[in-house]
Amino acid sequence: MKIICKWMGIALLALPTLFATNVMAQVLKKPTLEDLLPGGETYRIAENKWYQWYGDAACLELGIDSIKGIWAVNGVGAKAGENFTVITLKEANKLLAEKELGKLRNFYSAKTINTPHSAVIGILLQVDPLLLLNTGKYRVLIDWKKKELIWNQPCPAQAANEDWNEVSRHLAYTLNNNLYVMTNDGQTRQVTTEAEGIVCGQSVHRNEFGINKGTYWSPQGNLLAFYRMDESMVTQYPLVDITARIGELNNVRYPMAGMTSHKVTVGIYNTETQKTVYLNTGDPTDRYFTNISWAPDAKSIYLIELNRDQNHAKLCQYNTETGELMATLFEETHPKYVEPQHPIVFLPWDNNKFIYQSQRDGFNHLYLYNVKGELLKQLTQGEWLVQQVLGFNRQTQHVIIQSTETSPLQSNIYSVSLKDCKRSLLGNSEGIH
């Protein structure tokens, strides 16, 4: 009897271990190729993509059930490094339900409004605590501190190429080939009434030369520059839409080599007068108009004109009221080609100076100009590329760039002084930043 009890005790002690081993055997899974390859169904590289800035005060993380934040500076009732909850999905949907404006499933499409409400106080960007949300049927603004829904605008059905301005809260969009504007109070205005073959408010020139859209709001959002592309003279090319259950014919206009190309003009629509002025650029035949940018006061607009041979570019300034050419600031030529890819960027602290990007020395670099078209200095140089202008440090008067200076296999962030052109590496020097 004692022997039996002894073995029973051993068996009882072993049961938990056997049970745990059995559970582990059920949980453990051999990884498959699909599990280990990026882009597979069960594996993806972690990306810090759901983040927004609340002015210079805090960084917000957009999530499914809530938006979290961390204070970046010491403020009223907060310390740098402290975490806080901006708003929950339950709170947001309650505000939406009260006005029957739809429902959110997550906050991934939320956007902070970082327009200064009182310019720049000290060195920090002061902004209102507003979140732009889209339910699919309505675009809404929520004051996340007061937990109040302060504004809404219906989303136009079948709209494409939407371009919303956070200052005026006007929305530019296209229906088929024409351009429309919905004002901040929900009024719909048709800006163009063109027939088939003429496209307005959409990307032109086959998305070359940095063009990726067709509308450009002025800084205050009361003027809208847009492309008008006449391609009625371009031969149609048949393509088959294979996404349909039964293949469908889709004719597109494509200028083959040596054949007639489309003609592009640039219009400026005034939301207050509801009138449109077209820039007097002359005959648009075999010319490209690219890299549109506004002067800070919106009294003039800048663009780069390029010939069809793509070896002669001109930076031109036009009057936004009359559409007349005010000045050709400078020209750039090359025996083979020039490739303007970026609009000029004005310095936040000086409306009379701007940064121009060019590959004139064989590598894409930054050049500082004044509004008279005079080259003040070359800000960056070397056998490497400036990939992006990311922003500015107003306090130190530096421009922040992404470049390949460390290695052509890497992208690193640098701070460049506009005073002496010295560069400082931000963060470590390894990897993609």
Regions inferred by a protein language model and the residue ranges of each:
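Positively charged n-region of N-terminal signal peptides that target proteins for export
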Residues: M1-W7
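Bacterial N-terminal signal peptides
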Residues: G9-A20
